[in-house]
UniProtKB/Swiss-Prot annotation:
Recorded domain comment: Specificity for G(s) G alpha proteins is determined by the length of transmembrane regions 5 and 6 (TM5 and TM6).
Gene name linked to the record: Htr4
Organism: Mus musculus (Mouse)
Glycosylation sites: 7
Extracellular topology ranges: 1-19, 79-92, 158-188, 284-290
Protein name: 5-hydroxytryptamine receptor 4
PANTHER family listed in its UniProt record: ADRENERGIC RECEPTOR-RELATED G-PROTEIN COUPLED RECEPTOR (PTHR24248), OCTOPAMINE RECEPTOR BETA-3R (PTHR24248:SF66)
Length: 388
């Protein structure tokens, strides 16, 4: 009898340690998501240069969606995991599930819009980009990112369309742990699984892959063009022309920006693809996927909500500078230098019948100087820059 009591006590102690470790991990994930996404939103609101970049409107809206996930969805899921019971009633379970689907879908829609914005900026002429990405169109795209997901979240879930034909399976799953506790179980039938997964993940993912492929091809073509210009300049003059130097810089800037967004998209797909693949497969194998696998894949997706801000900090120079200014209490070292002194008119130069002049601020020997640069006619170079 004493041996049995000792085993029971040992198991309870092990479970207590497990719960402490699990709670600590989930708390770190939630806190990281809240603080990181708040930092992104504050950075864009305070930094005038970040507000001028149209892509950042989508990034702020994406950060807001991730912030809502970390505040309205993740804490209740963490409490359910630690306490091994859902104590908030069936109606709030439906609301929480609807918010989960809504915000997850909104996140990937935002990433799709960001990829389309970068496609028009890098692969099209500047005039085409300005005509395509007008303030009205940006507002409509942002509205669509929030409104369209409601048709696969609140509407079908509140109406119970997702559980038609599988109510008995759901009831068994709710009480599978013990007779005195229930879980907030979200299971879907075959029609809803296919519709939700295709709309929320597979179609946007395909659009993003196509957009970034075209960006990669365009960047490669312009890299070859600039290399040819540099070789031609080297044969005629020993010193590289400002046009070639600035064109190369702008091309590299846009290419790095595209790579940054590709990394963000890749991390999103890595985090959410296992869930969406399982979501579409499970109904066709009689719901035999273990609950532990579902939970692991779901929280892998939640981790993405706290991952994007750190990707911006490490891969984007403008965001990194804005973060440092906020965290270091407006330290003057991290602020952009103003252009001081009187400006001298820049001389114009004609290349292939087109005249282009640009004044820029550069660092030279620890001092900031205003200089003139010649810009090349290129859809990649002329696209709206993302400072990386």
């Amino acid at each position: 009898m004493d041996k049995l009591d000792a085993n029971v006590s040992s198991n309870e102690g092990f479970r207590s340690v497990e719960k402490v470790v699990l709670l600590t991990f989930l708390a770190v994930v939630i806190l990281m998501a809240i603080l990181g996404n708040l930092l992104v939103m504050v950075a864009v609101c305070r930094d005038r240069q970040l507000r001028k970049i149209k892509t950042n409107y989508f990034i702020v809206s994406l950060a807001f969606a991730d912030l809502l996930v970390s505040v309205l969805v993740m804490p209740f899921g963490a409490i359910e995991l630690v306490q091994d019971i859902w104590a908030y009633g069936e109606m709030f379970c439906l609301v929480r599930t609807s918010l989960d689907v809504l915000l997850t879908t909104a996140s990937i829609f935002h990433l799709c819009c960001i990829s389309l914005d970068r496609y028009y900026a890098i692969c099209c002429q500047p005039l085409v980009y300005r005509n395509k990405m007008t303030p009205l169109r940006i507002a409509l795209m942002l509205g669509g990112c929030w409104v369209l997901p409601m048709f696969i979240s609140f509407l079908p879930i509140m109406q119970g369309w997702n559980n038609i034909g599988i109510v008995d399976v759901i009831e068994k799953r709710k009480f599978s742990h013990n007779s005195n506790s229930t879980w907030c179980v979200f299971m879907v039938n075959k029609p809803y699984a296919i519709t939700c997964s295709v709309v929320a993940f597979y179609i946007p993912f395909l659009l993003m892959v196509l957009a970034y492929y075209r960006i990669y091809v365009t960047a490669k073509e312009h890299a070859q063009q600039i290399q040819m210009l540099q070789r031609a300049g080297a044969t005629s003059e020993s010193r590289p022309q400002p046009a070639d130097q600035h064109s190369t810089h702008r091309m590299r800037t846009e290419t790095k920006a595209a790579k940054t967004l590709c990394v963000i998209m890749g991390c999103f797909c890595f985090c959410w693809a296992p869930f969406f693949v399982t979501n579409i497969v499970d109904p066709f194998i009689d719901y035999t996927v273990p609950e532990q696998v579902w939970t692991a894949f779901l929280w892998l997706g939640y981790i993405n909500s706290g991952l994007n801000p750190f990707l911006y900090a490490f891969l984007n120079k403008s965001f990194r500078r804005a973060f440092l200014i906020i965290l270091c209490c407006d330290d003057e070292r991290y602020k952009r230098p103003p252009i001081l002194g009187q400006t001298v008119p820049c001389s114009t130069t004609t290349i292939n019948g087109s005249t282009h002049v640009l004044r820029d601020t550069v660092e030279c020997g620890g001092q900031w100087e205003s200089r003139c640069h010649l810009t090349a006619t290129s859809p990649l170079v002329a696209a709206q820059p993302s400072d990386t």
